[in-house]
Amino acid sequence: MLRGGICAVSGVRAYGIRENNRGLALIEGKGKAVGMFTMNKMKAAPLIFTQRLLLENGRISAIIANSGCANSFTGEEGMRNANRMAELASAVLGVDKSEVAVASTGPIGKQLDIAMIARQVQEVAKRLTSDPEGSAAAAKAIMTTDTFPKELAIKVGEVTIGGIAKGSGMIYPHLATATMLAFIYTDAELDRETMRTCLKDACDNSFNMIVVDGDMSTNDMVLLVSRGGKEISAENFKTGLNYLCKELAKMIARDGEGATKFIEVNVSLKGAPVSQGDAKLIAREILRSPLVKSAIFGERIDLACGRIIAAIGSCTSTSTSTVPEVEVISMKFRGKEQEVEVVRNGRIVGRWNHEVMKGKEITIDIVLGGGEGESEGEKETTATATAWGCDLSCDYVMLNASML
């Protein structure tokens, strides 16, 4: 790992400021670009603007992102304001407006304070830097209910990949061709099709596998910008990008609104046929259940076990693919120093040991299928998936009852 987040990539400058709950970040760095965006049909104005930019141009010279207002469900005025943000960044940085991506995060239904953004842009532009402090300031500027900035940079051979992200609530991304935002830069020499393939794979295994509250934002966005110059194989780049995105995604899950515990769910499906899509569905739906999350907050392993079983049965009942018999299930809970098996081949085993639930990190391992009754000679296949999330606390309710 490297210091510097996005600024670890040569030629990238960034900075950001916050005024109370309103922030603004600028990132400057030209390159080929691809993105992944929310599948929510109520797409925010900046997301529509940036999607069009990538379709028409395919290059980004700068990103301007504000926090404190989502500019979502804001009609024609919202689109004009998104366009105005791009104009402001274009003017102060001396880049073409058609290469300025726009992102916003915050409450839905409010118009942007363009006068404030115009003033903030001038201040931020004066302080743009390629030093690590620039990335850190930009990561802080896009925070809303986040409690800490999220940034990471790694080396894959000679190639650098750096990113910043934000997210704490309204986290149940469905990113496709994520409120969480992530901006990733690299100096890898890649064509856009390779970038698009690698980013989709990375998002499918990271941001699309985190759940805080089960609500999909109108503003979720992940951008990948390649400045080029360093050679790397597509496979090696994909491995590095997957790692970086998973680590950023786990930071978001750890920082879930009001969270007291970080939860990892590992699902293995055994039998024929099985699919990774089903394994992912089950892992996500377990973490989406408010009953499961509240039982973990209450440190009740018995309640958590029963509610997980119900969640599995519920999501597999509507699955379009074939899954193993849900009755053939095994389940373990793991803490930092303890491991408790609660279900083996569809039967409750042992006593309820609530001590394993008292740590800050809980891992739940679930195996479906492959138990007693499997046909002799039948070839067993396995599909696995991992999802990350957090518990549901009283603080989450209080925070969202009086949001910002």
Residue ranges of each PLM-predicted region?
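A structural signal for small-residue-enriched, beta-sheet-centric alpha/beta enzyme cores
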Residues: 1-66, 70-80, 91-373, 377-404
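Generic structural marker for isolated residues within well-ordered, non-membrane alpha-helices
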Residues: 86
